[in-house]
Curated annotation (Swiss-Prot):
CDD domains: ScCit1-2_like. Belongs to the citrate synthase family. It catalyses: oxaloacetate + acetyl-CoA + H2O = citrate + CoA + H(+). Pathway: Carbohydrate metabolism; tricarboxylic acid cycle; isocitrate from oxaloacetate: step 1/2. This is Citrate synthase, mitochondrial. Residues 1-35 form a transit peptide. It is found in: Mitochondrion matrix. GO terms for cellular component: mitochondrial matrix; mitochondrion. InterPro entries: Citrate_synth-like_lrg_a-sub, Citrate_synth-like_sm_a-sub, Citrate_synthase, Citrate_synthase_AS, Citrate_synthase_euk, Citrate_synthase_sf. GO terms for biological process: carbohydrate metabolic process; citrate metabolic process; tricarboxylic acid cycle.
Length: 474
């Protein structure tokens, strides 16, 4: 029988903090793999690249630090700072026409280049995490080692389990998720080291360890919340020889369906990062800039993600589609859908899942999910309805004339896929989004600490002060 990895979190942390190579053997997804000095770990890879990255930033600021990179209008100040260039975010850049690139790679390129599970079609999110932190596409061995390391760090403290168990089932899953992540502050290596006094150059080491521990524990936390609120409260243990997405699917209770496991791999990858200006990413960065631990920083980001304008859109899409079917009935003709779209707009409501603050074309994250559905569930009635709306809505929204982007975003599709595979509890979906988003925001937090990023402190003005600034009388 293949051996499985059995390495305590404390032993793993002490070994990695000390810079010692961790030798481990694990049968990963049926393939035996070994992590030794021959294969660079994620931490070693990042540490090797760090001096060169620091030098690039130093040179850029020295030679061009006084260059103007943009202008700010009064409308932007009042309009949520849309389009204001003022954040540094290494992992991804969003182009309004092309969509997201992760370290320069499009989603189709990531699907092609990032390692997959044996027999799988979708990239493993472990590979994307590696890419976001280092800028390099990892080898299959490196991804398997990272999966094994997260599995080794996954055990939850007893008090976290008890904390979740004590939450009333009526408490929103996102509130429970944020609560549990906040409570993991008790385990923070960074907080403990900072309290004792450490050199600033060591900040990133402890931030890395906290981030790895935190990510490793998120599937069990998320699954425990789901099983407590919607099922029997029983959660399967992490399987040390399986990848991150498989374990999440298994703990939720859906691993018997290989296609659902593949969906989780795709979902966790494409929802992870979308530049640094969105609420969850910016909040995590902002709170982290005060040297709060990764636990407190991510919890703050999760609270932002829980807002209706950020992470609840896929739930609203499902509600809107369900309402349409009730109103329209069996006559789901193009004209009836067009009429329903107009009734939504004329009632002063938005069409959920359409439009984006930055994008001006169809979201490639939507496209990747659509392609998945075309392969796996082409005859599903809800998928057919989503496809029909996709054909009709852009024209209606363009004619309506009040949106800069009449095309679908990522939220227009994800809920329908989850529903198809039996995960029907829509108010839980944002928790899955939160697990994924951690994979995008925590690499930047590690980078922030490694670069010595300062506390964020923009300038604010009152309306009267702005009026004076622009020469207006109120």
């Amino acid at each position: 029988m293949a051996s499985t990895l059995r390495l305590s979190t404390s032993a793993l942390r002490s070994s990695t903090l000390a810079g010692k190579p961790v030798v481990q053997s694990v049968a990963f997804n049926g393939l035996r793999c070994y992590s030794t000095g021959k294969t660079k770990s994620l931490k070693e890879t990042f540490a090797d690249k760090l001096p060169g990255e620091l030098e690039k930033v130093k040179k850029l600021r020295k030679e061009h630090g006084n260059k103007v990179i943009g202008e700010l209008t009064l409308d932007q100040a009042y309009g949520g700072a849309r389009g204001v260039k003022c954040l540094v975010w290494e992992g991804s850049v969003l182009d309004s026409e092309e969509g997201i690139r992760f370290r320069g790679l499009t989603i189709p390129e990531c699907q092609k280049l990032l390692p997959k599970a044996p027999g799988g079609e979708e990239p493993l999110p472990e590979g994307l995490f590696w890419l976001l932190l280092t800028g390099e596409v990892p080898s299959e061995q490196q991804v398997r080692d990272l999966s094994a390391e997260w599995a080794a760090r996954s055990d939850l403290p007893k008090f976290i389990e008890e904390l979740i168990d004590r939450c009333p089932s009526t408490l929103h899953p996102m509130a429970q998720f944020s609560l549990a992540v906040t409570a993991l502050e008790h385990e923070s290596a960074f907080a403990k080291a900072y309290a004792k006094g450490i050199n600033k150059k060591e900040y990133w080491h402890y931030t890395f360890e906290d981030s790895m521990d935190l990510i490793a524990k998120l599937p069990t936390i998320a699954a425990k919340i789901y099983r407590n609120v919607f099922k029997d409260g029983k959660v399967a243990p992490i399987q040390k020889d399986k990848d991150y997405s498989y374990n999440l699917a298994n703990q939720l209770g859906f691993a018997d369906n290989k296609d659902f496991v593949e969906l989780m791999r795709l979902y966790l990858t494409i929802h992870s990062d979308h530049e640094g200006g969105n609420v969850s990413a910016h909040t995590t960065h902002l709170v982290g800039s005060a040297l709060s631990s990764p636990m407190l920083s991510l919890a703050a980001g999760l609270n932002g993600l829980a807002g209706p304008l950020h992470g609840l859109a896929n739930q609203e899409v499902l509600n809107w589609l369900t309402e349409m079917k009730k109103v329209v009935g069996n006559d789901l003709s193009d004209q009836s859908i067009k009429d329903y779209l107009w009734s939504t707009l004329n009632a002063g409501r938005v069409v959920p899942g359409y439009g984006h603050a930055v994008l001006r074309k169809t979201d490639p994250r939507y496209t990747s999910q659509r392609e998945f559905a075309l392969r796996k569930l082409p005859d599903d009635p809800m998928f057919k309805l989503v496809s029909q709306v996709y054909k009709i809505a852009p024209g209606v929204l363009t004619e309506h004339g009040k949106t800069k982007n009449p095309y679908p975003n990522v939220d227009a599709h994800s809920g329908v896929l989850l529903q198809y595979y039996g995960l029907t509890e829509a108010n839980y979906y944002t928790v899955l989004f939160g697990v994924s988003r951690a994979l995008g925001v925590l690499p930047q937090l590690i980078i922030d600490r490694a670069f010595g990023a300062p506390i964020e402190r923009p300038k604010s003005f009152s309306t009267e002060a702005y009026a004076k600034l622009v020469g207006a009388k109120l």
